[in-house]
Amino acid sequence: MSVGRGAPPGRGATVGYSGTPLVRKLGIKPGARLGLIRAPEGFDVTLGELPPGVRIRRRLAGEPFDVIVAFHTRRAELQRRLPRLADALDPAGGLWMAWPKRASGASTDLTDNVVRNLGLAAGLVDNKVCAIDETWSGLRLVYRLRDRPPRRP
C-alpha cells in the first residue's frame, strides 16, 4: 500500500492546508521516545527530519513511549492490539492511531468513529486529528487527566 510521496530528506512532510511539518503535528519533541508500529514502507521519509535526541523503536517492549504512531487497516486487529498499545504509552503521552483514508482506495473497515469508539473502550479519549499523508488519517488518543495511571520509569 502506498503512503504517498513522502518528503525530501531533511524536510518534514506537510499534508493538508496547514503547511505544518508532520513531526510537529504529531507532537514529536526533542528527546522523545517514539514508537512506529507497523509503519508502511517509506514512512521514515514521510516523517522527515526528527528533533534532536528522538529515540525510535518499532516494538512495544521496553520503557513507555511519549508518542506512538500505529498503523492498522482492520477493526478486529486494532481492537485486539489497542490494550497493549495503551499499556506501552507513557501516561502523559499520545497514541496516534492511523488508518487508510476512504479516498486512498485501500481496503479498510476503519473510520474515525470506529477508532474513537475503540479508544473509549480502552480508556482513552481523542484530542487531535491529523492528515498523516495522502493515504493515512490519524486520531490522537490520550488518557484523561483523571484516569492517568501512575508514571512508569
What would you call each of these model-derived segments?
Residues 109-130:
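Conserved Class I S-adenosyl-L-methionine
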Residues 91-100:
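Conserved beta-strand signature within the Rossmann-like core of class I S-adenosyl-L-methionine
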Residues 68-78:
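Short, glycine-rich nucleotide/cofactor-binding loops
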Residues 5-45:
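N-terminal, charge-rich interaction modules
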Residues 123-153:
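Class I S-adenosyl-L-methionine
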Residues 79-91:
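A short glycine-rich, Lys/Arg-flanked "PGG" loop and its adjoining helix->strand segment in the class I
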Residues 101-106:
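Short histidine/acidic/glycine/proline-rich micro-motifs that form metal-
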Residues 54-65:
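Short acidic low-complexity segments
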